[in-house]
């Protein structure tokens, strides 16, 4: 994006009140994997948002009377883009819970990668308007296999949180 905070605030100040403000939720989120410091440049499933700059932007936009949106990839991201969705449900629920705690109710979902109609679309609907009850969703979605799927996806999520994806390292 390459805009500093001052440029963001100035842009929002110049918008008419009917214009809605959308941020990539994870943009700029800082993280460390195996001692390598990095930050999210685009989207991330392994490092759930929102980032500090997205939080500040939504807060500023709301103060100025704008409706706000979170742009998120839930199914997958460039971290692992060749699959329809990544079954790391605890990370996806963590992201939705963080957005819910900020009263973010509007999303642009999985718009570029992983547009596959995965179970994650029902997770968003299940979590709308409150705390994301992952276990309740798994029971509704998976029936008697819910506990086994929960255990597996917790392991996947723990591993994926340590996935060494860094655009800065990748393209140097």
Task: Mark where each language-model region is.
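Substrate-binding groove of N-acetylhexosamine-processing glycoside hydrolases
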Residues: 1-172
């Amino acid at each position: 994006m390459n805009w500093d905070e001052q440029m963001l605030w100035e842009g929002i100040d110049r918008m008419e009140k009917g214009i809605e403000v959308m941020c990539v939720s994870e943009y700029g989120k800082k993280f460390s994997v195996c001692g390598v410091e990095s930050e999210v440049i685009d989207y991330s499933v392994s490092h759930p948002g929102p980032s500090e700059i997205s939080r500040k932007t939504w807060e500023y936009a709301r103060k100025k009377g704008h409706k706000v949106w979170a742009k998120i990839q839930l199914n997958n991201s460039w971290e692992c883009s060749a699959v329809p969705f990544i079954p790391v449900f605890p990370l996806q629920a963590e992201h939705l819970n963080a957005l819910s705690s900020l009263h973010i109710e509007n999303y642009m979902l999985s718009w570029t990668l992983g547009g596959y109609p995965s179970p994650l679309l029902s997770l968003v609907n299940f979590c709308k308007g409150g705390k994301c009850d992952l276990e309740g969703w798994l029971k509704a979605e998976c029936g008697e296999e819910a506990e086994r799927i929960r255990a597996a996806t917790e392991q996947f999520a723990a591993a994926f949180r340590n996935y060494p994806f860094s655009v800065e390292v990748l393209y140097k």
